[in-house]
């Protein structure tokens, strides 16, 4: 089997994990206590990539929840799905990382890391052919940034060749949950850059807007946001959990989306996200949903791909979709002038089709639709997101604001400068990748 272990770190990671596993269970007909009613025996058993079978008719998620403080994980321990997870898969510390990368990475995180790696080792031993790890976390929090980067470093040591995909919550441009988010984000990006194979970014503000605009939710809660994020995660992982016409496996994402090791931050878009009232009046053909993927309104990160160039696009369809319609839709997109590809990657479309229609959480905001598409695109526009973050970092760091909290936890000030330089290099990498290849052919050689 090609198993995947999901690791949910910090409050954001754990709450997204909650939403994802709720959705997986609905998709596979697994009850909240892990049993599967006998009549719905799955043919193909593909879902065992994410669930392990205990042999006594119970299915346990191959996942781990880690937080440096207990309150968020306690909600799972006492919630609807408390019987689904093995109690050993919930690991919590006593004191939290206090939005401080250094606490998550050095002081508080150090005490938990060995327990976590031990549990991961047990899950890995239970797999016959472990394919890789899916790590969910936020950039802004102390645990999400600091502990994740520590974990990724250690996973590289223990499981060198296994792929590691990240699902990161990027700090929203307007809505901030912590003053030091820019510090944490840049430190964690710098540390995990060489350890992560592919990182899907999602920013809360973009999803707030989707909730308000498409779902008519006036004041979205984290539950609303996480249910949308879980649909995206579900689309990305659907091909590992179901049998489809064009299946995409973990390594295939990387092969098709990552042209250079550092340029591994695809932009996610998902359509259709509409409320039940609207769905009733819309047709939503394959070409409709494919086109709307290219609209900035449906993207999970605030940036404008019309200002950037696409390097690669991966379209993951699910539901009632036939390849012929997809080809027609893609051909139409290629003729549009607004959608530009870099000149060294002319074709650039990878397609996955899965016949399992999208599932929605009963009583949620999303309408049940016959087909949906998730688009993962590697575009130079995402550099906008980095430059925004770098700018905020610079404003604070010029005054050395809040730096003493990090240094007090055993970090050196040099790490800030080093991380900031690495991100400047990343912005430059994006710039060079987007530049036309016929300009300045001299200095090509030494970059990679």
Curated annotation (Swiss-Prot):
Phenotypic effect of disruption: RNAi-mediated knockdown abolishes recruitment of microtubule end-binding protein EB1/ebp-2 to a wound site. Almost completely abolishes induction of nlp-29 expression upon infection with Drechmeria coniospora, or upon wounding. Severely compromises expression pattern and recruitment of snf-12 upon wounding.
Annotated positions for site Involved in polymerization: 448
Reactions that this protein is recorded to catalyse: GTP + H2O = GDP + phosphate + H(+)
Cysteines engaged in disulfide bonds, as pairs: none
Alphabetical keyword list: Cytoplasm, Cytoskeleton, GTP-binding, Hydrolase, Magnesium, Metal-binding, Microtubule, Nucleotide-binding
Tissue expression pattern: Expressed in intestine, pharyngeal muscle cells, and a subset of neurons.
Segments crossing the lipid bilayer: none
Gene3D superfamilies for the chain: Helix hairpin bin, Tubulin/FtsZ, C-terminal domain, Tubulin/FtsZ, GTPase domain
Annotated residues for binding of GTP: 11, 69, 138, 142-143, 177, 204, 226
Record bears the keyword Coiled coil: no
Cofactor(s) listed in the protein's UniProt record: Mg(2+)
Function: Tubulin is the major constituent of microtubules, a cylinder consisting of laterally associated linear protofilaments composed of alpha- and beta-tubulin heterodimers. Microtubules grow by the addition of GTP-tubulin dimers to the microtubule end, where a stabilizing cap forms. Below the cap, tubulin dimers are in GDP-bound state, owing to GTPase activity of alpha-tubulin. Required for the normal dynamic behavior of the non-centrosomal microtubules in the epidermal syncytium. Involved in the redistribution of microtubule end-binding protein EB1/ebp-2 caused by wounding.
Family statement: Belongs to the tubulin family.
Protein name: Tubulin alpha-2 chain
Gene behind the chain: tba-2
């Amino acid at each position: 089997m090609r198993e995947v272990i999901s690791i949910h770190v910090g409050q954001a990671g754990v709450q997204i994990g909650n939403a994802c596993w709720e959705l997986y269970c609905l998709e596979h007909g697994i009850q909240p206590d892990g049993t599967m009613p006998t009549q719905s025996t799955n043919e193909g058993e593909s879902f065992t990539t994410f669930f392990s079978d205990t042999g006594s008719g119970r299915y346990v998620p191959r996942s781990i929840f880690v937080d440096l403080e207990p309150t968020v994980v306690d909600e799972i321990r006492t919630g609807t799905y408390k019987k689904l997870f093995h109690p050993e898969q919930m690991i919590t510390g006593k004191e939290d990382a206090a939005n401080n990368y250094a606490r998550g990475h050095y002081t508080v995180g150090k005490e938990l890391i060995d327990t976590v790696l031990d549990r991961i080792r047990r899950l890995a031993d239970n797999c016959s052919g472990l394919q890789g790890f899916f790590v969910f976390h936020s950039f802004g929090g102390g645990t999400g940034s600091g502990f994740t980067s520590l974990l990724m470093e250690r996973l590289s040591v223990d499981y060198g060749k296994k792929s590691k995909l990240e699902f990161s919550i990027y700090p929203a441009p307007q809505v901030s949950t912590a003053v030091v988010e820019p510090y944490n984000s840049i430190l964690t990006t710098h540390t995990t850059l060489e350890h992560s194979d592919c990182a899907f970014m999602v920013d809360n503000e973009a999803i707030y807007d989707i909730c308000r605009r498409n779902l008519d939710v006036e004041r979205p809660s984290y539950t609303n946001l996480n249910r949308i994020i879980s649909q995206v995660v579900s689309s990305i992982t659907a091909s590992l959990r179901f049998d489809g016409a064009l299946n995409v496996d973990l390594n295939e994402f990387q092969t098709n989306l990552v042209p250079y090791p550092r340029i591994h931050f695809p932009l996610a878009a998902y359509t259709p996200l509409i409320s039940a009232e609207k769905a009733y009046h819309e047709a939503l053909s394959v070409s409709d949903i494919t086109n709307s993927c290219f609209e900035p309104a449906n993207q999970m990160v605030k940036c404008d791909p019309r200002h950037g160039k696409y390097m690669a696009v991966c379209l993951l369809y699910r539901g009632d979709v036939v390849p012929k319609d997809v080809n027609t839709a893609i051909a139409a997109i290629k003729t549009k002038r607004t959608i530009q590809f870099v000149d060294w990657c002319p074709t650039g479309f990878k397609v996955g089709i899965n016949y399992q229609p999208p599932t929605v959480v009963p009583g949620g905001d999303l309408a049940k639709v016959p087909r949906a598409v998730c688009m993962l695109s590697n575009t130079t526009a995402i550099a906008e997101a980095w430059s925004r973050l770098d700018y905020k970092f610079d404003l604070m760091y010029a005054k050395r604001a809040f730096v003493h909290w990090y240094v007090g936890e055993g970090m050196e000030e040099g790490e800030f400068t080093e991380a900031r330089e690495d991100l400047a290099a990343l912005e430059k990498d994006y710039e060079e990748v987007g530049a036309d290849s016929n300009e300045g052919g001299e200095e090509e050689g030494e970059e990679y």
